[in-house]
Structures are given as structure tokens and as C-alpha cells.
Amino acid sequence: MERCDVVVIGAGPAGLATAGALRHYGIGATVLERDAIGASWRKHYDRLHLHTVRWLSHLPGYKMPRRYGDWVSRDDVVEYLEDYVDAHNIDVRQGVEVEGLERDGDGWRVRTSEGDFSAPRVVIATGYNKHQHLPDWPGLDTYTGDLTHSGNYKNADPYVGKNVLVVGTGNSGAEICVDLIESGAKHVQMSVRTPPTVLLRDNNGMPGQAFGVLFRHMPVGMMDRAWPLIQKTAVGDLSEYGLPLPPPGAYSKFLRDDVTPILDVGLVEMLKERKVEVVAAVERFEGADVVLADGSRIQPDAVIAGTGFTRGLEPLVGDLDLIEPVKGRPIVHGAETHPNAPGLYFIGYTNPVSGMFREIRIVAKRIAKSIARDRVPTE
């Protein structure tokens, strides 16, 4: 069994940020990754850019290069993560799958495909979007069209000349709608159950994220009342295009359920030009038909389900009573640990309006400070 000062599970932005922040205190972390560095980013769709601005999206101790531009591409994010590992000399063990985690005296034993690791501190950073979530729609097994999850979408090439239904109103679903139209899909519909909040990614040179940072310091009650006005000021009232203003209380729902606003990269224009049609929520499938909540039926050639992801933490820590039963999120996060699991940290499982990369940077520093304060070096 290999003894380590700290074991970090996951070599995505959150795991690497924590390992990099620990370097500031002279602590080396062993990062275990079942795939490759930044694996989830490598799998994203081709046109993806960060919806948060470069200068607010770096990890601890290493800025993103200016040559990446304001909105960093998928490939540049992957390059940045690889360079981050080199810059901080982080020990990343790729191809190592974690199979279990258990208490071992005052520390933890991490069981993996390559043997066991022991450490007094373990940081879990397996990712916000680990497993694709597909609703259990009635009749789904009868659908004769093509259906895929947005996590499998790479580009619009397979959909040129086709009628496509995109289900869901997250940032991925919104950008996929734009990509489909710009690349030659015949007709694009967007299925909406709960109208999203839509904000601008860029406000005449001011990134929308900067407002998100400000919003986090405002009273929640005030933000609940202001949220509809904020959208109306940013993009106008989209009700006539099928997206009514968010109701009062939408900001609280965002905080409670991690329902992120759409940071617009072209959807608003597509809606106003009637190039993307908003339709009701999907209720069920019947052969070639998709039956919607308003009773209407449509027959798209393909359905892309932008229906989100789950954290997938249950196999790893489900027996420790650390996971919210419905949402699957850890009940503690950041530098806070649970009495049932001292020395076990979670990072990267929130998606704040101020930006995930920025949040990761802040939380990683807090975790590193906590570990350094309580550190008992391994022999």
C-alpha cells in the first residue's frame, strides 16, 4: 500500500486546482485519474468555449495565457490543464480507477485498480457532470427516431437538413440549438418545461460573470425580486418567443437547485428571428411521435436530450451518509468536513452564478489551507 500526504480523486479542474493550491504549502498530492487529464473537457462538443471570462477563470497560482482570448475554447482549456500539471509538478496517476474508499485508522484507504493508497486526507473531485441523466419518459423504447444525450453531441454534421428537437434549457442545450441552425439543420425546436433565466455572456465588453460575482453578495430576497427585471434589462421580454420572464423566487430556486442561467451566445437572436421554435415539455414517446405536455405531437428526425448529469458519488461514498438523497450532492463542500468522515473533502459540486472555475479556485485554496493547518506528515 502506497502512503501519501493527500490523495485527490479526479484530474479535472477541481482536483488539479486543489493539488496546485497544496503546493503553495509545500504539500504534494497524489492525483488519481481513471482516464486522462481534463477527460470531461476533452469530450465536450467542438464549438464549446467557457461561458466565463478568461481573467476570472484561472486556477490557483497559474494564469490563463492572453492568447486564449476572452472566451477560452475547449481545446485551450485542455491545454491549460496539462500545462497546469507541469507548472506545479503535480503527481497525476492516469489510468487508475478508484474502486472504493474506507476509513483506515485516523485516515483513509483508497482502493484502486492499481493497488491501495493510504492518506490522512482525501479530496474527492470526480466532477459535476459525471453521468448522463436521461429522464424515464414513457414509451422511450418505442421511439423510431434518433435520440442522444447532449453529452454525446460533438457537432451538427449528423443533423444537417434534419428536424431536430433539443430538450432542456441549460447552457449546453441553448448552444447546441445555435450550432444546429448555423450548421444547416432544417428546423430546430427547443422543449421547455421550466422557463430559464437568460442573461448576456457579454454586456458591451463587461462579462456577465462580473455581474454574477456581484449578485452573490446581494441579499437573496432582493435578488428574487430583481431577477425578472435583470433578465428584461439584459435581453428584453422573450415571452412572445416562448420564454416568459422568470417568476419571483427564481433566484432562490437557482441557489437551491443549481438551475443555472443561460449565458447567451446566440440563442436570443435565433429566437427573435424565429429560427428556433420553443415547444412544450416532453411527456412521452409513441413510435415516431414525441407527445408534448400541451397535447401536441411532433415528429423530429432526431432528439438531443440536454437533460443534465448526475454527480455519481454514491458508489464511492454512499455508505458514509454524505450524499443528499435526491440531488446526489455532497452535504458538505469545500474546507468543511463531516463528523462521519474527518479528513474527507469535496470540491467542484456547486455551480454558482459567479462561475465554476472561479469558485473552484477559491474553494481549492480554502481546502489547502485547512489541510496545511491540520497536517500530520506521513512517515
Predicted regions, residues:
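Short, basic/glycine-rich phosphate-binding loops at helix/coil junctions
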Residues: 56-63, 244-249
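Flavin (primarily FAD) cofactor-binding/catalytic cores of flavoenzymes
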Residues: 2-11, 16-42, 69-171, 175-205, ...
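A short acidic, helix-capping loop that chelates divalent metal ions and anchors anionic groups
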Residues: 63-69
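Redox-cofactor-proximal catalytic regions of oxidoreductases
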Residues: 36-61
